[in-house]
Each structure stands twice: as structure tokens, then as C-alpha cells.
Amino acid sequence: MEESDRVARRWEDLDIDILVKIFQSFDIIELTSGIATVCTSWRMACCDPLLWRTLDLSMMKSNFIKIPLEPYVYVDARSDKTLNHLLKTSLSLSQGNIMTLIFHFNLYVSDDLLTYTAERCPRLRRLVMPAWNRIKKTGICKAIRIWQDLESLTMPSIANPPYLLEEIANNCKNFSELKVMGPFDNFFAATIITYLPKVRVLSLRCSMLVKDTLISILDELRNLEVLNISHCLLIEIPPPPAPRRIMRELDQCILDKASRLREFLTCMKDSCLMCQRTRNDEGLMRWYKYEEGVWKADEVSSLSL
């Protein structure tokens, strides 16, 4: 073929579907690094819904120090600026198509940024929450009112759960999955029973769990299909003056009550590394001590990241 007959095809002339296929191999940092500004066709490809079903920010952690006053953390300004740029660019490109949003548990998102995010991904179905410290009651409640399609929530434990779960009950009619990371007491269980009685999947893995609280869940959540208490520190509190004791195995009463479930996921093995870690941390997992990303695991496939 003569040189004059050759036709050089430019990158910007590539078919949109091909560009989308290429961009699917990019991570979130690359997608938001400016490739959408190259030309019109690249921006169209960058905005394709296929790229934005899930926004995974689980690799992002805040650079912070603990302080004695609320919100008990001080976040470095540069860290905040990086998150703001990445999140706002992603939300602009996604054009409201994000259905799964994943934050790192050590990411300290501001109240204003959470509200901004909710307004720009109203179709959200699954949320993995960041740390609570900088999020106010008004902010999360406003977000939940927007996220009416929410079905699944993974959240750090919270001292006052009723206002949050009531908001979910009032606004998220298809809500069915809840994972709580951190302390889970009888008050939290009673709140779920009151406001989310139709929840079908509940994961409490790697938490401290009192036997009576577990029995309440099994007795009262009649729509529950899947319960994960793997690696939990299960405590029995007998009447005084007897001391509380750590249960090394489930008794027949619990097994009988759990037999109605489709899946009852447990692990209480002395040889299990995660069980050892929960015991060593006294039921309050210090995830920062362990391998990066180990907090994402869950024996329930729909909750694993």
C-alpha cells in the first residue's frame, strides 16, 4: 500500500463503545484525572453509565489526628481538598447513574459533602458509609430522604440509632440489607426490631454480641433470612453475682431458633485468625492494625466488597 493511501485514525475518532471499553479498565483516579477534557467524544465516553454503576472510594483514607473535642478528629486540609476534587468530578461525570457508593471506614466526609453527594446520586441502592465524626443528624437524614431506592447499608456503629433507622423506614421501602461494623448492643437490636422489622439480611461479624441480644434478633425479626455472626465475641450475662462469660460454642436453644433461617453464618474457632483478633480487640475491631482491605470481607456475598 502506498503511503498516500494510508488513513491514520485519530484517538478522538474512535467509536464511543470502544472508548467506554477502554475506560472500564481505568481506576477512579485515572477516570477523574482529566481525560474527559481531551475532546467531546472522550467526555461522552467518560459519562457512560457503564462506568458509574459503582463509585468505589474504599482506597481513600483521610489524613487526620484525633482531638479531644467534637468531632474528635482534625482532617488535614490537603486531604479534604483531594477528596472534594475526586468526589465532585466523579459525581459530575456520573450524571446521576451511581447505584453503589463505597467509602473507606476511615474517611472523614464532611456533612456538606455528604449532602452534595446525595443530591447528585439520587438512584443509590447500596451505601458503604464513611466514619460518622463529621456527619450531623440533619445531614444524614437529608441524604436518606433523597436515597429512596436504598436497599443495602454498611455502617459503622452509632450511639443513637433510632433517628437513622426511622428515616430509613420512612423513606426506603425496598431496604433489606444491613451490616453494622462495631458495637452492637440490645438497644441497637431493639431499634432494628422496631423500625426495620422486614430486614432480610443482617451482618454483625467481628462484633461483641450478648446472647440475649442474639436471641431477641432471632425471635423478633421474623422476615430475617440471613444472619452473619461470624467471628463475633459472644457473651453470656447470667444473673448476679455470677460473672459474664465468653461462649465458645452456640447452645442448642440458639441453633433451634436459627434453624428457620436460610443462612446462619457462624465461626467461633480458636484456630480462626479473625476470631482471635475479635477476642484480642475485645469485640471492638481495630481494623487499622490489620491488612489493608481486610475490613471489606463478609461471609454474606452480597455484602462483601
Question: Which residue stretches match the model-derived regions?
Answer:
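The conserved beta-strand core of Leucine-Rich Repeat
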Residues: 1-305
